[in-house]
């Protein structure tokens, strides 16, 4: 099977959203267990199904030992051209505000920019709705590829702890990261503060480029240092305690949005 023919197809790994003639990645099956929804998937007539299970209808399946590894391999080829300046913002509170203010500031200064997060997908003063703080991996990649084609090289993404644990930022590298704050939250999912912090630190351990910048305050800097993040090849840009040279001229609020 030629790789070129595969990367020309739209990708999917969610059987609920699968469309006809898309390339489907079966992350559920393994050598011994088959995906319980495989019949429903076949009814949707995908182009091919990448799987680890030896199904009988061989003409419709591509057998791979590790589907996830093959998925990442194809993604790197299909999405090789993405915006150069990617910023990730994480933290218990403030992610949405920071992402939205970043987008507004660059837009006001006539710098093409995009934002992905709780409020949705923003680019060139346009908007698309999103149901998740950090959308799934393919939605992010498709959006970033789209804005790159429209000459947008700056984008900020909200990196939620759920999204980080679930690998929604796979195949992305960030030059800059912002850690707003850290306090008790989402313990129904993470079970403990240690687990919650570990989820946040995935961003800094896995998705930052070398010599990237981490923007945070003194408390977060100490937290990162304690977890050996600052020992890596990063620049820590600490929040200044001095008065900032900004003045609030006006602001308007609408639903979840605030415009400064």
At which residue positions do the language-model features occur?
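Active-site regions of enzymes building and remodeling cell-envelope glycoconjugates
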Residues: 2, 47, 57-68, 128-131, ...
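A short helix->loop->beta-strand "cap" motif at the edges of active sites that frequently abuts
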Residues: 44-49, 59, 83-84, 207-213, ...
């Amino acid at each position: 099977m030629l790789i070129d023919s595969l990367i020309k197809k739209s990708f999917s790994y969610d059987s609920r959203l699968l469309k006809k003639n898309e390339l489907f990645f079966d992350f559920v099956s393994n050598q011994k267990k088959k995906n319980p929804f495989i019949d429903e998937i076949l009814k949707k007539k995908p182009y091919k199904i990448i799987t680890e299970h030896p199904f009988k209808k061989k003409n419709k399946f591509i057998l791979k030992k590790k589907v996830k590894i093959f998925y990442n391999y194809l993604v790197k080829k299909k999405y090789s051209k993405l915006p150069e300046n990617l910023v990730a913002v994480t933290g218990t509170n403030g992610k949405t505000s920071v992402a939205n203010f970043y987008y507004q500031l660059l837009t006001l200064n006539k710098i093409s920019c995009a934002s992905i997060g709780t409020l949705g997908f923003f680019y060139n003063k346009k908007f698309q709705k999103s149901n998740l703080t950090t959308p799934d991996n393919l939605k992010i990649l498709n959006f970033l590829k789209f804005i790159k084609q429209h000459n947008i090289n700056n984008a900020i993404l909200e990196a939620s702890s759920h999204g980080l644990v679930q690998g929604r930022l796979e195949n992305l590298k960030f030059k800059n990261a912002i850690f707003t704050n850290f306090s008790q939250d989402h313990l129904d999912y993470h079970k403990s503060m240690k687990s919650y912090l570990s989820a946040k630190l995935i961003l800094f351990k896995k998705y930052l480029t070398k010599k990237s910048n981490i923007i945070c305050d003194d408390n977060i800097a100490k937290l990162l240092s304690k977890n050996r993040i600052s020992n890596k090849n990063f620049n820590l840009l600490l929040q200044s305690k001095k008065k900032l040279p900004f003045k609030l001229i006006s602001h308007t609020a609408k639903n979840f949005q605030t415009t400064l």
